[in-house]
C-alpha cells in the first residue's frame, strides 16, 4: 500500500481499511471496534471498571514480592521517551522500588533520548546501564537490501527485549517494568498478527545462510517460546495497565520533575522514538497498510484515554525526505533503496 491522499479509516478508531485484514462496514466501523463493544457488553465487570485506588493497590501487591531480593528490585527499560521516563518515576516515587535503569541504543538514538535518561536517573538517584549494539545497523542494511516485506519495529523490539532480559538474568533481577501503554501491548493485538507472521517468515528465510545472524533465528521462529524458555522466571509488566495514561499529565510531570525535553523532531508527533522509526513506519505503510502505531492509538481511543481527533493528528505526522535520509545514510543506503524520491506524507483521513 502506498501513501495515498485519502485513507478510509474506522469512524470510531483510526484503523485504515486494508482488504482482507481490516474491514470497515457500511456504518464506517471496523471489526475490532465491534468486537470491543460486544466484549464490554458481555462482561459484567472488567478490570477497567475498577477505580484508580483499587488498580494501584493491585499493582503494589504484584511488585511487593520482588522487593529487597538483591541489589535491585527491578529493571526499568528506559528509552528516553515520555512513557518510559514516567515509568521510572512511578517505580521510585509511587511503588518505592530500587530499580536498575537499562537504556539500549539500537544505533539510531536521538541526542535528547540520552539527555532525558541521564537527567531522570541523576535526579531519581537510579543506577544506569547503557547497552549499545552494532548488530542492528548491519542487520537492517541486509534486510532493506533484500526488498522483503518486513516489520522493522517487531524485529527491533525482539532484539531490545532480548538485551534487557539477558541483563536481568545476568544481575539476578526477576521483574521488568516497561513504559508500555495499553495500546502498546503490541504482541497481543489481533490486527497485527498477520504482519508479524509474514515478517517473521521473511526474516527467518533471510537469516538461514547468514553465519553472523543465524543465532537470532530461534527468536523469530517463536518469540513467546524463546523468551519463556530462556527467561521464564522474569516477570514483565507495565504500570500503565494499572495507572491511567494521560499524555498531558505525563508531559507536565516529567518536564517539571525530571527535566525531560521533547525531541526537536521525531515520529510520530510528541514522541521520542529513534530516528529509524521514520523508515520503519514508511515501509510498514507501504508493505502492510498500517503498523503498531495505528493499533496502539486505536486501543487508547476505545479505552477513552485518547480522543480520535488527537489520534488522527498523531498518525498524520508527516515523513519527509530528510527524515528518511538521516536513518538510511547511517546504513550506507539511500532513498532509492526504498523508493524513488519525493515528499512522504501520511494519507489524510477520510470517513
List each model region and its residues.
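Short, glycine-rich nucleotide/cofactor-binding loops
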Residues: 74-83
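Hydrophobic positions on the alpha1 helix immediately C-terminal to the Walker A/P-loop
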Residues: 86-87
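Nucleotide-activated chemistry modules centered on ATP-dependent adenylation/adenylyltransferase
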Residues: 1-74, 90-351
Amino acid at each position: 500500500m502506498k501513501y495515498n491522499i485519502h485513507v478510509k479509516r474506522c469512524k470510531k478508531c483510526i484503523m485504515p481499511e486494508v482488504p482482507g485484514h481490516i474491514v470497515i462496514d457500511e456504518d464506517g466501523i471496523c471489526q475490532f471496534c465491534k468486537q470491543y463493544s460486544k466484549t464490554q457488553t458481555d462482561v459484567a465487570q472488567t478490570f477497567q471498571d475498577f477505580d484508580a485506588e483499587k488498580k494501584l493497590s493491585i499493582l503494589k501487591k504484584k511488585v511487593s514480592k520482588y522487593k529487597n531480593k538483591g541489589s535491585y528490585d527491578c529493571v526499568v527499560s528506559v528509552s528516553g521517551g515520555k512513557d518510559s521516563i514516567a515509568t521510572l518515576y512511578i517505580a521510585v516515587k509511587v511503588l518505592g522500588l530500587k530499580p536498575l535503569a537499562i537504556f539500549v541504543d539500537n544505533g539510531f538514538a536521538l541526542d535528547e533520548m540520552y539527555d532525558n535518561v541521564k537527567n531522570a536517573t541523576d535526579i531519581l538517584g537510579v543506577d544506569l546501564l547503557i547497552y549499545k549494539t552494532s548488530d542492528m545497523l548491519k542487520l537492517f542494511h541486509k534486510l532493506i537490501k533484500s526488498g522483503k516485506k518486513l516489520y522493522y519495529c517487531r524485529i527491533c523490539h525482539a532484539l531490545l527485549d532480548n538485551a534487557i532480559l539477558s541483563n536481568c538474568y545476568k544481575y539476578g533481577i526477576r521483574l521488568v517494568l516497561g513504559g508500555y501503554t495499553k495500546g502498546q501491548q503490541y504482541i497481543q493485538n489481533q490486527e497485527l498478527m498477520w504482519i508479524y507472521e509474514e515478517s517473521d517468515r521473511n526474516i527467518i528465510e533471510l537469516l538461514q545462510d547468514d553465519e553472523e545472524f543465524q543465532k537470532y533465528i530461534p527468536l523469530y521462529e517463536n518469540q513467546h517460546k524463546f523468551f519463556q524458555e530462556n527467561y521464564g522466571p522474569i516477570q514483565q509488566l507495565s504500570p500503565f495497565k494499572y495507572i491511567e495514561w494521560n499524555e498531558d499529565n505525563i508531559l507536565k510531570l516529567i518536564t517539571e520533575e525530571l527535566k525531560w525535553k521533547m525531541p526537536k523532531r521525531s515520529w510520530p508527533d510528541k514522541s521520542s522514538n529513534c530516528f529509524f522509526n521514520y523508515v520503519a513506519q514508511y515501509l510498514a505503510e507501504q508493505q502492510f497498510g498500517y503498523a503498531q502505531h495505528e493499533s496502539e492509538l486505536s486501543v487508547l481511543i476505545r479505552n477513552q484515554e485518547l480522543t480520535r481527533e488527537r489520534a488522527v493528528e498523531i498518525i498524520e505526522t508527516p515523513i519527509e525526505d530528510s527524515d528518511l535520509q538521516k536513518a538510511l545514510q547511517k546504513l550506507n543506503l539511500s532513498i532509492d533503496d526504498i523508493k524513488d524520491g519525493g515528499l512522504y506524507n501520511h494519507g489524510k483521513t477520510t470517513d
